[in-house]
Amino acid sequence: MSLRQIAFYGKGGIGKSTTSQNTLAALVELDQKILIVGCDPKADSTRLILHAKAQDTVLHLAAEAGSVEDLELEDVLKIGYKGIKCVESGGPEPGVGCAGRGVITSINFLEENGAYDDVDYVSYDVLGDVVCGGFAMPIRENKAQEIYIVMSGEMMALYAANNIAKGILKYAHSGGVRLGGLICNERQTDKEIDLASALAARLGTQLIHFVPRDNIVQHAELRRMTVIEYAPDSQQAQEYRQLANKVHANKGKGTIPTPITMEELEEMLMDFGIMKSEEQQLAELQAKEAAKA
């Protein structure tokens, strides 16, 4: 089987790392060999797989050793739950340098040192509020072929998902990158599944799975475990297995996204009654003022 390079993008705090690690833990049950490359400066892309606080990052270890050339693969690559290989690229100190540089350095080092040999999936976990050059690196350099956007029914998550789709479109024609689908991580906002489905349709993709909110996820996280490991027989574990099966069956089915404008996004929110038009806001304000008079 040829190597599948997938990436999970999403705005900070959306539950992207949790969703990706639970999905990958479920993929292992399908006898898939997996390498996770964390591309988020928080370096939390592997903690549930390694049961550790935060993995030492490639950038941190390279700084200690002198340069990345002074590192060995075993210095940066750790083996976690059911043999999943884990690497964190890391980022610079806040306010200094470009976090994307760590991503570029790490991927090149891993490829040159054979980390991609003998795996079925490489999964990049990428911060997606900013689709700056560095964080777009897995897309731009034609590494990640299938992008899964983790989002919710909240306006900023929808906005970020649309922005990420713009980033994918920019490189879709020059490389082979495609949008695999949206994963909605339930926030229990109004009309959430309908909104997520509507955005997926507008972006020319699918809502690949709607992950319901369940406190068992937090219980597992406190123990630095995936739900798959902590509560394998739970309904939530089944949700992640369904998501993993859908991702596994989605090979070659990605699309070139059709992002929408900010105005179109706001119109969509108004159609769903989530956002009020300026006329409605003005009318409400006038009604309030009239009531005071």
Swiss-Prot record:
It comes from the Bacteria. InterPro entries: NifH/chlL_CS, NifH/frxC, Nitrogenase_Fe_NifH, P-loop_NTPase. One of its GO terms (molecular function) is nitrogenase activity. Its EC number is 1.18.6.1. It is an enzyme of class 1 (oxidoreductase). The keyword 4Fe-4S applies. Keywords: 4Fe-4S, ADP-ribosylation, ATP-binding, Iron, Iron-sulfur, Metal-binding, Nitrogen fixation, Nucleotide-binding, Oxidoreductase. [4Fe-4S] cluster binds at residues 98, 132. Binds 1 [4Fe-4S] cluster per dimer. It catalyses: N2 + 8 reduced [2Fe-2S]-[ferredoxin] + 16 ATP + 16 H2O = H2 + 8 oxidized [2Fe-2S]-[ferredoxin] + 2 NH4(+) + 16 ADP + 16 phosphate + 6 H(+). The key enzymatic reactions in nitrogen fixation are catalyzed by the nitrogenase complex, which has 2 components: the iron protein and the molybdenum-iron protein. Homodimer. This is Nitrogenase iron protein. The lineage of its organism: Bacteria, Pseudomonadati, Pseudomonadota, Alphaproteobacteria, Rhodospirillales.
